[in-house]
Amino acid sequence: MFSTLLAVFIGGGVGSVARWQLGVKFNNLYPTLPLGTLLANLIGAFVIGGALAFFLRHPHLDQDWKILITTGLCGGLTTFSTFSAEVIMFLQSGQLAAAGLHVLLNLAGSLLMTALAFALVTWVTTH
């Protein structure tokens, strides 16, 4: 149990610091697109897609490694709450196009990145 908590703690800490840094470096570049949030979600989606494919092909790996990457790292890196708050702020300020673009890029982009990474890792590990 302690090793699992430690895995979540370490992965979550690394992911959260990475998300914070992405926000600091990129969120102010485009006023109508919080790029740091988008990058955090797209990178996290790619990592979890690749991890899912990898772990499916390596079921013998210790569960704590899976939890460190998925629940910890990806959970700390990605941010549905910040994304949701940004959409609401766009809507409150009447920026409907920015809100719609943010929703489209984050949701569709994250799904595409997850699928892309899953397919890529599957292809690499079977060839």
From Swiss-Prot:
What's the short name of a Pfam family annotated to this entry? CRCB
Question: Lineage in the entry?
Answer: Bacteria, Pseudomonadati, Pseudomonadota, Gammaproteobacteria, Enterobacterales
InterPro entries per the record?
A: FluC (IPR003691)
GO biological processes: cellular detoxification of fluoride
Q: Please list the reactions this protein catalyses.
A: fluoride(in) = fluoride(out)
* Keywords tagged on the record: Cell inner membrane, Cell membrane, Ion channel, Ion transport, Membrane, Metal-binding, Sodium, Transmembrane, Transmembrane helix, Transport
Task: Give yes or no: UniProt keyword Membrane.
Answer: yes
One GO cellular component term of this record is: plasma membrane
Asked if the keyword tRNA processing belongs to this entry, the reply reads no
* Superkingdom to which the source organism belongs: Bacteria
TM annotation in the entry: 4-24, 35-55, 71-91, 103-123
Major site of localization recorded for this protein: membrane
GO MF annotation terms: fluoride channel activity; metal ion binding
Which positions does UniProt annotate for Na(+) binding?
A: G75, T78
The UniProt family comment states: Belongs to the fluoride channel Fluc/FEX (TC 1.A.43) family.
Q: How is its activity regulated?
A: Na(+) is not transported, but it plays an essential structural role and its presence is essential for fluoride channel function.
The annotated topology with respect to the bilayer is: Multi-pass membrane protein
Functionally, this protein is described as follows: Fluoride-specific ion channel. Important for reducing fluoride concentration in the cell, thus reducing its toxicity.
Q: Where in the cell is it found?
A: Cell inner membrane
What is the species listed in this Swiss-Prot or TrEMBL entry? Pectobacterium carotovorum subsp. carotovorum (strain PC1)
Q: What is this protein called?
A: Fluoride-specific ion channel FluC
